[in-house]
Amino acid sequence: MSASQDSRSRDNGPDGMEPEGVIESNWNEIVDSFDDMNLSESLLRGIYAYGFEKPSAIQQRAILPCIKGYDVIAQAQSGTGKTATFAISILQQIELDLKATQALVLAPTRELAQQIQKVVMALGDYMGASCHACIGGTNVRAEVQKLQMEAPHIIVGTPGRVFDMLNRRYLSPKYIKMFVLDEADEMLSRGFKDQIYDIFQKLNSNTQVVLLSATMPSDVLEVTKKFMRDPIRILVKKEELTLEGIRQFYINVEREEWKLDTLCDLYETLTITQAVIFINTRRKVDWLTEKMHARDFTASAMHGDMDQKERDVIMREFRSGSSRVLITTDLLARGIDVQQVSLVINYDLPTNRENYIHRIGRGGRFGRKGVAINMVTEEDKRTLRDIETFYNTSIEEMPLNVADLI
């Protein structure tokens, strides 16, 4: 059933998700049931089997224009169902009888690409759709064989490997009709902008373009003008972007060298189901992990210097719960859905304030409550105030009873 945009409903999504911030949109159709989206029966079965009951606010607004073929810029908080928004749209549009790649999804990290692939496969479970993760760090020959022998309906990948496969003509753009950029702010930042543009040049001029992300600074919106045609905009106001359901605190540590003792004190105070500790450099991740192990605290480490197999093992252990604390760089801050994470510790405040929401979004996804604790030295106080202003939020000093909140 559709309603006008003016009603600006704040319905709960799957699993009692907290209401999302009001979405600003130039699209006036809100469809509050998957049954009313004219989706195929087999796709609907996959959606309900996956555990969705009702579309989240972003899904109510963005799925329909995506299916209708419009270029779409969709913005919503982490954990509100952005991945399923484009996965459902792709699965509805592909022709299963056509054994050719028809949709291309790009993600900034290998882990996120693999997670998107899993969501697509799960939602399309009853359709027989094929989806392949085309990522760096894996065997090129096996990749080429897969693309040539099978031509999967959907490719999810990282920019470097995808461009390589397109450039060497192992991946054909001939039938690609939908191009999705997930975590678009990261993808279009300095590191990936040129690669994205090169990939886009190889696609058909009438290819539909969909961008999704939690943050979309104005310079990114400028870049989208280069390769999007009158896009539908579905945006959350900036001041409503910080996550509801996440309690945010800071600990005053004055000096950098006191952070380690403070972290160990926290460990002893809290019963942690699962936690992610964010640090700004790879070298410091290794340093902190060693220091924690020396003090008999268990923790796993993950960063971009590790090879893909090692990263896969660490993520598997963390997802299964056999490892409870993960120390990482911003590599993990982009959309990795680890359901049990109740606590995020920013050992270092992010150097880019827009990464803050990606980091603390690890706790409280789909309405699960979470706590974020920021370790703040004298030098960090200005950065903390800057984050508070940017997100129009309040980060309070950590109370003594923090253990009761996790």
Swiss-Prot record:
There is a cross-link at residues 146, 225, 238, 309, 369, 381 (Glycyl lysine isopeptide (Lys-Gly) (interchain with G-Cter in SUMO2)). GO terms for biological process: positive regulation of transcription by RNA polymerase II. It catalyses: ATP + H2O = ADP + phosphate + H(+). It comes from the Eukaryota. GO terms for cellular component: cytoplasmic stress granule; nuclear stress granule; perinuclear region of cytoplasm; plasma membrane. The modification Phosphothreonine is found at residue 158. InterPro entries: DEAD/DEAH_box_helicase_dom, EIF4A_DEADc, Helicase_ATP-bd, Helicase_C-like, P-loop_NTPase, RNA-helicase_DEAD-box_CS, RNA_helicase_DEAD_Q_motif. GO terms for molecular function: ATP binding; ATP hydrolysis activity; RNA binding; RNA helicase activity; translation initiation factor activity. Belongs to the DEAD box helicase family. eIF4A subfamily. This is Eukaryotic initiation factor 4A-I. It comes from Macaca fascicularis (Crab-eating macaque).
